[in-house]
């Protein structure tokens, strides 16, 4: 039986890894072993940060809502409690957008939350 060398398979594998490593710095882009190691690490970071992004955005929205609440003489926790008691079901993303872009509408919502307390 003839001996089969891995030439075609190896070249295809190396091309695939080096293509994904485009944009990496120095040898991490050009050398297969370094590129492969960096690519594995990069994919781990990407996986982790896709999940972390949701937490980061929620924290950002809470900071923005809290800042707008303070302008309306409310704390964030009392504001959220007031919204629940008033039966207003707006999520934090929408509330943060209103706080940034439509201050008057947010002030009305804050007043409704104050009355419900």
Curated annotation (Swiss-Prot):
<dbReference type="InterPro" id="IPR049946">
    <property type="entry name" value="RIBOSOMAL_L20_CS"/>
</dbReference>
<dbReference type="GO" id="GO:1990904">
    <property type="term" value="C:ribonucleoprotein complex"/>
</dbReference>
<dbReference type="GO" id="GO:0005840">
    <property type="term" value="C:ribosome"/>
</dbReference>
<keyword id="KW-0699">rRNA-binding</keyword>
<dbReference type="InterPro" id="IPR035566">
    <property type="entry name" value="Ribosomal_protein_bL20_C"/>
</dbReference>
<dbReference type="InterPro" id="IPR005813">
    <property type="entry name" value="Ribosomal_bL20"/>
</dbReference>
<keyword id="KW-0694">RNA-binding</keyword>
<dbReference type="GO" id="GO:0006412">
    <property type="term" value="P:translation"/>
</dbReference>
<dbReference type="GO" id="GO:0003735">
    <property type="term" value="F:structural constituent of ribosome"/>
</dbReference>
<comment type="function">
    <text>Binds directly to 23S ribosomal RNA and is necessary for the in vitro assembly process of the 50S ribosomal subunit. It is not involved in the protein synthesizing functions of that subunit.</text>
</comment>
<dbReference type="GO" id="GO:0000027">
    <property type="term" value="P:ribosomal large subunit assembly"/>
</dbReference>
<comment type="similarity">
    <text>Belongs to the bacterial ribosomal protein bL20 family.</text>
</comment>
<keyword id="KW-0689">Ribosomal protein</keyword>
<keyword id="KW-0687">Ribonucleoprotein</keyword>
<protein>
    <recommendedName>
        <fullName>Large ribosomal subunit protein bL20</fullName>
    </recommendedName>
</protein>
<dbReference type="Pfam" id="PF00453">
    <property type="entry name" value="Ribosomal_L20"/>
</dbReference>
<dbReference type="GO" id="GO:0019843">
    <property type="term" value="F:rRNA binding"/>
</dbReference>
């Amino acid at each position: 039986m003839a001996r089969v060398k891995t030439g075609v398979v190896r070249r295809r594998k190396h091309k695939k890894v080096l293509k994904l490593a485009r944009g990496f710095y120095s040898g991490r882009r050009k050398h297969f072993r370094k590129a492969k190691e960096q690519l594995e690490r990069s994919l781990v970071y990407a996986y982790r940060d896709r999940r972390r992004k949701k937490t980061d955005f929620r924290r950002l929205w809470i900071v923005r809502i809290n800042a707008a609440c303070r302008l309306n003489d409310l704390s964030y926790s009392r504001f959220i409690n007031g919204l629940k008691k008033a039966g207003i079901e707006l999520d934090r993303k929408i509330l943060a957008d209103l706080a940034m872009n439509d201050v008057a509408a947010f002030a009305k919502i804050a007043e409704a939350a104050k009355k419900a307390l």
